[in-house]
């Protein structure tokens, strides 16, 4: 199979010194991508031509950054990648906001604060938007208004990796992984646990040895995970 590059673009100033994973979102004829400084750009999928862009407001930080991972002056930048669902572009920020934008023109529909930094791209289904934050809390928001519908909290170990699992919604059930080594299935309607499965057991003498984070996206294949 011969593969050729049709087009390529750099989004804004890239990621800078930030340790974040920003996968783009794809919907219809749009590819939506973010940089590490609050810029979100929608490109034509076939030509690479910019269609619209949004720049999120900057927030002044006090104190010093840790190991240069954050700049002193940072926008509320997209921290978990770009999600697509319910006819919207869905992003979470380092300042604990979930923002819903119109796919066609990038206009903001709503934004809701969910607490801490959003660690993965939001997903949507059955009239709700689901988001997971770095404190291992899953929040369900009303897709029309952004109002909080329910939350689910998982007990975190003392030491974890930076990052979270990306929730996946399928047939009324939300699947996601947590820093305690468990994968959990939640009812999309109310957040009630259906089942949980430990995929790794913590072993070792130190907290570092005992890290068992599930940080990857859950993959579903028919009746298997």
Regions found by a protein language model. Name each.
Residues 35, 93-94, 133-134, 178-179:
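Structural signature of WD-repeat beta-propellers
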Residues 15-20, 26, 32-35, 41-43:
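Structural recognition of beta-strand segments within beta-rich domains
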Residues 44-47, 102-105, 142-146, 187-191:
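Short loop/turn segments that connect beta-strands within beta-propeller blades
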Residues 2-25, 53-83, 108-125, 148-171, ...:
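Extracytoplasmic beta-rich repeat domains
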Residues 35-57:
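Beta-propeller domains
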């Amino acid at each position: 199979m011969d593969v050729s590059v049709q087009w390529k673009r750099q989004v804004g100033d890239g990621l800078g010194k930030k340790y974040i994973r920003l996968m783009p979102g794809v919907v219809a004829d749009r590819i939506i991508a973010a940089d590490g400084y609050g810029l979100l750009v929608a490109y034509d999928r076939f030509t690479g031509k910019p269609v619209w862009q949004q720049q999120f407001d900057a927030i002044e930080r006090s104190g010093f950054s840790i190991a240069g991972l954050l700049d002193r002056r940072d926008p509320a930048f997209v921290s978990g990648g770009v999600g697509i669902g319910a006819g919207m572009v869905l992003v979470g920020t380092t300042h604990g906001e979930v923002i819903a934008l119109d796919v066609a023109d990038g206009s903001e529909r709503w934004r809701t604060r969910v607490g801490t930094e959003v660690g993965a791209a939001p997903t949507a289904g059955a009239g709700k938007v689901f988001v997971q934050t770095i404190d291992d809390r899953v929040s369900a928001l009303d897709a029309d208004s952004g109002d909080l519908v329910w939350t689910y909290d998982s007990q975190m170990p003392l030491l974890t990796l930076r990052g979270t699992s990306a929730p996946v919604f399928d047939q009324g059930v939300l699947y996601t992984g947590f820093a305690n080594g468990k994968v959990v299935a939640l009812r999309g309607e109310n957040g009630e646990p259906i089942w949980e499965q430990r995929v790794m057991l913590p072993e070792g003498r130190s907290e570092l040895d005992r890290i068992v984070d599930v940080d990857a996206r859950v993959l579903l294949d028919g009746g298997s995970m």
